[in-house]
Amino acid sequence: MILGIMGAMPDEVDQLCAKLENVTVEPYGGVEYHKGTLAGKQVVVCCAGMGKANAAATTQVLITKFGAEKIIFSGIAGNMTSKIGIGDVVIGKTVLYHDAQLDMICQNPPFLKEYSGDPELIAAAEAAC
């Protein structure tokens, strides 16, 4: 299994890239994809750039070009609350649109208001915390 790990800014992925073994860098679409092993697992690490359009495009490249079966987004996640501090971990069990009318979104494929996270990754993240 290949794991895709992405962040929005270089500071969010640079330390991961530095820990990769047997690393190769493959530029594609303006993004550098760092392929290698981390803790014995095959991973592809990249900096997607900020915003959901960049995240969506980079996620699709990780899946279709690099064969990533699971994706982890690592970073500051645009924290807008004082309840979450530096070093805290947020595990997203579901994600949804915040800037579109959900009734309109659900009229078109894939007809979903929200997307569930991968149960295996959620369990692993919870166990690590």
Regions found by a protein language model. Give the residues of each.
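A generic local secondary-structure boundary/capping motif
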Residues: Q60-V61, G78-M80
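Mid-sequence, gly/pro-rich, charge-dense loop/helix-turn segments that line enzyme active sites
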Residues: M80-C129
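Proline-aspartate-enriched helix->loop->beta-strand connector
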Residues: A68-I72
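Short active-site-adjacent helix-start/loop capping segments
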Residues: V13-D14, K52-A55, N79-K83, D99-A100
